[in-house]
Every structure is written in C-alpha cells, then in structure tokens.
C-alpha cells in the first residue's frame, strides 16, 4: 500500500500532526465522502459563491488537497491552534496550501461546509502523550520581519571601484542609444513605487513630488530647497551598482517623448545644486538604477508642462541640489532612496524632453557635475544611470545634439574635459554625466533653465571646482578611502530563526528503555575479562608483563582448555603449552613490551635468548606440546582437521610462518622459538603460545600482512599445509602473497623460499617458510620445528588459528577468549597483541619490527636466534632475519594468515577452512593486528576450529 488510507477519519487524526511536520510532503488526499457518494464523477460546484474567483478549479475527483472555501473556515476553526506549529501553520496554511486561494476564513461554513464531510479538520489531534516525540530537532524557520541585511558594514565601507576597461576612451565620443527598455518600467503615474517605509526619506515629499504637476517641476519638492541638492549629492555617494544608483538618483528614465527626452537629462544641469547633486551621485556607488531611484526622481510621465521643469526642478535652486546631494548620501537600494526622493520621473511630453536633456548643457555647473561624474567609478552605464538621467533614445534631431551638446559651451567643455578624465566608454561617461548631452544648442535654447541657469551654473561650477580641488586632489586618494560619509546602518538584530523546543528532549525511547544493555558479568572462569585486563594493562604498562605472564600461563591452559573440549591431547598440550606459554608469555610480554618500546626489544631479546635456552628445553615439551598443541590447535584451528592434515604442513606452516623461526628455531628455535617465540610471544615456553604469540606476532604481523597472507597463507597454509611440502607451490602462491610476507618471514628463513614463497615458485621452499624452514625446520625443526611447528603450528595454528581465526574470530574470542591464547595471544597478542602491538610492532611494524616482530619472532627468533640465529638463523637466521623481517612481516602475515591458515590451514589444513578463516582472517588478519592484540590468540585456539571452520 503506497499510502495509508489517510483520508479516513481514524487515520486523519493520527497522521495529521505528523504529516504537517514531515520533511516530505505526503500527497494528502482528502475525500469528501458525501461528494464521492453523491456525484462522484461530477465536478463539485464551487462551494462558496462569495469567492467565485477563488473557487477551486474543479474537484472533478472527490479529492482535494484542502477543504474548499467553506471548509477552510472550518479548518481554521477545527484546527484552531492545534498543538504546536501545525496548528498555527494550519490556519494560515490551509488556504494557502489548497490550490484555491481561499482566505483562511472564507466565511462561515457554507452549505458544502465540512459539516457533512469527514475531513481532517474535524479531528483534533489526540491530546494524549502519543508515541514519544521524535528526537529529531524541530527546526522551524522563523523569518524575522526585518529584511535580511545583505551587505556587511565592511562591504559598505569599502566598495569596489570599477576599474576602467581597456579601450574605454571617454574622450572619444561614442554615439549612444540607450534602449528605452533599459530603464525600469515607469511606475504608475504619481504613484511612487513602494519602498520600505524606513527607506522613505520623505514619503510625503515623494508623493508631492510625483504628483506635483507644475511646481519647480516634477521634482518640485526636491527642487524646493537646498535639501534636495544635498540629497542628491548624497545619493551619488551612495554605493551600489549603477542601476541601483540611478534609480537611486530617482530619475528612472523612462522613455520620454522625443522632445522631452532632451530636457529630461537637462534638468540636473539647471543649477549648481543639481550639479553638486550629480557630482555626489557620481560618487555614489551602486547600480545606476539604484542611485537614480535614490535621487528619487523616478520619472513618471508628467504632463508636458511639468516635464520640463521636472528635471529642472532640482536645478531650481541650490536647495534642490543640496537635497539631491543628501539623497546621494542616503544609503539603500536606489528604488528605496528614489522613492525616498520621491521624484519618480515619468516620461515627459516631447516639448519638455528637450529641456530635460538640455539642462546639463546649460552651464558649467553641469560640467562640474560631469567632471565629478567622471570621477565616479563604474561602468558608464552605471554612472550615467547613477546620474540618474537614463538616456533614452532621442529623436534624430536631438540625437545630433546629444552628441553635440558638449560642444555647446565652456561648461560643456569642462564637462567633457572631465569626462575624459572619467574612465569608461564615452557612452558610459556621458550617461554618467547624466546629461545625455543633447545638443547644447538645443539644450540651451530649449531649456527653461538656459538663461538664468547660466549664471547659477557658473557660480556653481566655481564652487564645485574649489570643492573638487580641495577635496579630491587625486583619484587615488579617493579610490582607497573608506566611504566615511555613509551613515552607519543600524544593525538589525535578526530574530533567531531557530526556536528550540521548550521542553528538553528526552533521548530515551520506549524501545531503548526496554532493552537496556547489561554489562556482561565476568565469571570466575571467564578468562576473557582477565585476559583483556591483562592486555589492556599490557598496552598501558608494557613492563608489567611478568605477573600477567604468569596468569597467562594459567590462562593459556584455560584457553587451551577451551579447545580442550576438542581434544584431550590438547589439554595435555595445553598444560605443557601453559607452562611453555607461561615462559613464553613472559617472553611474549617482553616482546609485547618491546613492541611498546624498542628499548624493551633489547630486553626482549635478552629474555628471548634466555628463554630460548629455556625454550630449548621447553621446545621439547613444546614439541610435544607443539604437536599436541598442533592438534589442539588444529582442533582449534580447523583445529584437528586442519592440523592433522595440515599438521605436517601445519607444523611446516607454522614453520613456515615460523618457518623462519622454526627452522633454526625448531631446534634452537624450538627453544628459540620458545625463546624466540617467547621472545616473540611468550615464545618458547608456550611455543604454541609462543608461537601463538609468535605466530601471533606473525599473525599479527600477518595480521596486517595476514590479510593477504592469511588468505594466501590460508591457501598457502591450507595448500601449504596440505601441500605444504607438496603444495608448496600452491601454498607458495597462496603463500606467495602470503609468503611474500610470510615468505619474507620465511623468506629469511628460506630466502629462496621467501622468494618462492613470495612467488609460489619455490613452492617447496616457499612452501612456507616451512618449505625451507620446514625443510630445515622440518628437518631440524621438522621434529622440533614440526613439533615446534606443530607446537607452533599448534601454537601458531592455535595461535594463528587462534590468532588468525582467533585473530579474526579468535580475535573475537581472543578478545573474549584469550584465556590462554588470550594469554599467549593475550600476551602474545599482547606480546603479539603487542606483537601485534609489540610483535606486530615488532612484527606489526614487523617488517621493520618483524625483524623485531620476528624480533619477537625472528628477533626473538632472530635475536633469540640471534644467538640462536646461528642455527635458526640458518634458515631463519639469515632468512629469518632477512625474510623474517620482510617475511616475517609477511610471515607474520603468513603466520597470521599462514598461521591463521597455518593454524587454520595447517590446522584444518584449513586450506579451505583456513582460507575462509584466512579470509576471515584475511580481513581478520588485518583485524587481527587490531583485534588480535586485544584478544589473545590462544583463546581463539579453542574456538579456532569453529572459527576457522566457521569463519568462512
């Protein structure tokens, strides 16, 4: 059902409140059932004859968005101040919303009123506390009454001066025909355009002006006194695009009859005032229309007689000039100002037009005027308009004059001279002059202002010149001067537009209240908690690992126990591993600590060495454990499956992983591994662990590497495990990626193998490290390594598994489970987690540190092996170191993966499984690094099997 039946009464009540506030408009459909039943097909008659115009077009379908007229009233009534915005909005909205323009209260309900229909208006919202109010902030936009201030004070102070354009040579006259259309359409006669009251300078003036048929002219009022002149001057100062300014000037030029047009422009020239006026205007910034309007002469058509005077008015006296001058100063969009000025110029009859344009030519004043104009910045059209005389096309005769005008007299000359100074195309300038120059002859002859204007103009000019010279010595001085004469605008404090809800939002929903999370309560048997705590402290206090280490031993037994379910062997091994791991853990912790600190690494190495010795002893156990671990790990990994299958391989794989480690390690490494592993993880003690750790380390390393490696290794592991010897190639491949990393690990172990491993090519060697490593480790290590490996494998597997899968899942488990793995892994993880962190660091950085990581592993191995290296170094030593570093990085990955795989793969053989786990681990591998650290690897061991198997 696309839309619920929201037209039914039951639903309406429910939905309305929401619908009103919804973000999306629901296509609301209200059906008047009466309509539907009575005459479904027929378009309902417009309900309220009183408002026929507004009546809905036709409700052909008995569906309408809003109630019809009669109803709207009902709506208002019913909706009343419905709760919240919806109510208020509703009343107003109802009418508006409906396409019909019904007034909110169109009248009392008419016959068709809602009385007979079921409409939402008939239903009030339930007053009950309905479902919890939404937590979504309600943003109701409350626009403020005050207009939004679009220009900052700063912008007002520093307005851009238009730059002269290339090719604008004001002194080269260009015939200019401004299309009549350029001006805004004439306002209704006598009707100033509406402007905000605030802007109105003298609303009264306006109307008077506008209406004043005779008087000084249309501009009579402004003309009345100096005021107007000042006004205009100000206006000019006003900033804004020219069109703004012009309008500001208030001469909105509308096309005048030919005769007039001349005069129109002429007016300003009439007197100094006007000149000053214009001068200012020029200064004024803003679009011309703004200024013009500002000037307030919005030209409206005046009766012919007037028109002449209209422009002339300002010229009438200085007063007018002053007036205008002020206007110019006035800020605001031109239309605002103009209106303010109140002279909306209207087209004048032909006779007038001449005068109007002619005016400017009248005297020098005009020239001065123009001079200023020239100074004024802006494209000519801007300026001209600014001047407020929008030139309108003149009849041919005039047009000649227009251009000719300047020639008329000295004034004009001065004018032009100035003009030249003025930047911009001539037409621009001319317009700026605002006198579209009409032939001087014409202008003078016709202009009423002609004769008397002359004397005035001269005086005015003189004055202007003085002013100009004193104030405006260089354009630069003005160009970068802040506009100080702009009256600061009183900042408008806008009402905040977002009204936050009064009541505090309760962010608890009934749902969240119902299902409160319970912190899982740790059980005594729960190693996860302890493990996690250990790991956490490990990270924070890397040096306090020994106590933890010991716990880990216990824990590692437990984690292994976790896997114990899988096999008794596992338990036995677990015990061994536990002991081994305890030692390892110490080592691991060292490694982890080391990871935290490189300093620690030296310590780690020492520990590893010491432990390596211990480990050697333990390795045997490890071996036992190793294999055993392997199995458990296998169990854990794929655990049994993989291991058994993979065990050889697994061993190898771990070997691989640990290959480097194991190879030499197995023997040495076995111990070393233990040591190394220990060093690495706990390393030897719990090779499994250690290896877990180591592997962890690798794993972790692998973790990072593991992603690929794990996968690869997964395969590798699986294949390697499976193929480990046989499949070396495949594993190699798998491993190649993995191996590359593992390879590296092993690479060091088996340099070639590393390569091979890198590439599957030396599958055998690549096998994993185990290939070579295995070869040796297997050989040497085979027993040891294998066991170790196994141990490792197991460990690794366990670890890896744990780590890998664990890392992945185990990671989870580890996170959780790390009981042992956690320990081991925890430690390892720590160590390794650290490894991940530390080993990882060691190994994580593994590549860098892998050396370290392997440091833990190899370093442990290598280092441990360092001493041990001799032997392990063989395979592992050099390779290990080499590869381990590299490989180990990878190897770790491999172990991670490989181990994961190894563990998983070996464990499972989990080639396949491993792969998945690997996959899991692949991702997990990466995670491992992250996760692994937190979850001990070991723990995963037990779950590993599941994880590994399950993870895919």
UniProtKB/Swiss-Prot annotation:
<feature type="region of interest" description="5 X approximate tandem repeat Mc">
    <location>
        <begin position="222"/>
        <end position="451"/>
    </location>
</feature>
<comment type="subunit">
    <text>Interacts with calmodulin (via C-terminus); the interaction is dependent on Ca(2+). Interacts (via C-terminus) with TMEM106B (via N-terminus). Interacts with ZDHHC13 (via ANK repeats). Interacts with ZDHHC17 (via ANK repeats).</text>
</comment>
<feature type="lipid moiety-binding region" description="S-palmitoyl cysteine">
    <location>
        <position position="10"/>
    </location>
</feature>
<feature type="compositionally biased region" description="Basic and acidic residues">
    <location>
        <begin position="711"/>
        <end position="725"/>
    </location>
</feature>
<feature type="repeat" description="Mc-3">
    <location>
        <begin position="314"/>
        <end position="359"/>
    </location>
</feature>
<keyword id="KW-0112">Calmodulin-binding</keyword>
<feature type="compositionally biased region" description="Basic and acidic residues">
    <location>
        <begin position="776"/>
        <end position="792"/>
    </location>
</feature>
<dbReference type="GO" id="GO:0000226">
    <property type="term" value="P:microtubule cytoskeleton organization"/>
</dbReference>
<feature type="modified residue" description="Phosphoserine">
    <location>
        <position position="681"/>
    </location>
</feature>
<keyword id="KW-0968">Cytoplasmic vesicle</keyword>
<dbReference type="GO" id="GO:0030705">
    <property type="term" value="P:cytoskeleton-dependent intracellular transport"/>
</dbReference>
<dbReference type="GO" id="GO:0030425">
    <property type="term" value="C:dendrite"/>
</dbReference>
<feature type="compositionally biased region" description="Pro residues">
    <location>
        <begin position="41"/>
        <end position="55"/>
    </location>
</feature>
<keyword id="KW-0564">Palmitate</keyword>
<dbReference type="GO" id="GO:0005801">
    <property type="term" value="C:cis-Golgi network"/>
</dbReference>
<keyword id="KW-0966">Cell projection</keyword>
<feature type="region of interest" description="Disordered">
    <location>
        <begin position="486"/>
        <end position="952"/>
    </location>
</feature>
<feature type="compositionally biased region" description="Basic and acidic residues">
    <location>
        <begin position="119"/>
        <end position="139"/>
    </location>
</feature>
<feature type="modified residue" description="Phosphoserine">
    <location>
        <position position="590"/>
    </location>
</feature>
<feature type="repeat" description="Mc-5">
    <location>
        <begin position="406"/>
        <end position="451"/>
    </location>
</feature>
<feature type="region of interest" description="Calmodulin-binding">
    <location>
        <begin position="325"/>
        <end position="339"/>
    </location>
</feature>
<feature type="compositionally biased region" description="Pro residues">
    <location>
        <begin position="761"/>
        <end position="775"/>
    </location>
</feature>
<dbReference type="GO" id="GO:0008017">
    <property type="term" value="F:microtubule binding"/>
</dbReference>
<feature type="region of interest" description="Calmodulin-binding">
    <location>
        <begin position="421"/>
        <end position="435"/>
    </location>
</feature>
<dbReference type="GO" id="GO:0099503">
    <property type="term" value="C:secretory vesicle"/>
</dbReference>
<feature type="region of interest" description="Calmodulin-binding">
    <location>
        <begin position="124"/>
        <end position="138"/>
    </location>
</feature>
<feature type="region of interest" description="Disordered">
    <location>
        <begin position="37"/>
        <end position="457"/>
    </location>
</feature>
<protein>
    <recommendedName>
        <fullName>Microtubule-associated protein 6</fullName>
    </recommendedName>
</protein>
<feature type="region of interest" description="Calmodulin-binding">
    <location>
        <begin position="559"/>
        <end position="573"/>
    </location>
</feature>
<dbReference type="GO" id="GO:1904115">
    <property type="term" value="C:axon cytoplasm"/>
</dbReference>
<dbReference type="GO" id="GO:0005874">
    <property type="term" value="C:microtubule"/>
</dbReference>
<feature type="modified residue" description="Phosphoserine">
    <location>
        <position position="98"/>
    </location>
</feature>
<feature type="repeat" description="Mc-1">
    <location>
        <begin position="222"/>
        <end position="267"/>
    </location>
</feature>
<feature type="region of interest" description="Mn 3">
    <location>
        <begin position="473"/>
        <end position="496"/>
    </location>
</feature>
<comment type="similarity">
    <text>Belongs to the STOP family.</text>
</comment>
<feature type="region of interest" description="Calmodulin-binding">
    <location>
        <begin position="160"/>
        <end position="174"/>
    </location>
</feature>
<keyword id="KW-0206">Cytoskeleton</keyword>
<feature type="region of interest" description="Calmodulin-binding">
    <location>
        <begin position="532"/>
        <end position="546"/>
    </location>
</feature>
<keyword id="KW-0493">Microtubule</keyword>
<feature type="region of interest" description="Mn 2">
    <location>
        <begin position="151"/>
        <end position="174"/>
    </location>
</feature>
<feature type="region of interest" description="Calmodulin-binding">
    <location>
        <begin position="481"/>
        <end position="495"/>
    </location>
</feature>
<feature type="region of interest" description="Calmodulin-binding">
    <location>
        <begin position="373"/>
        <end position="387"/>
    </location>
</feature>
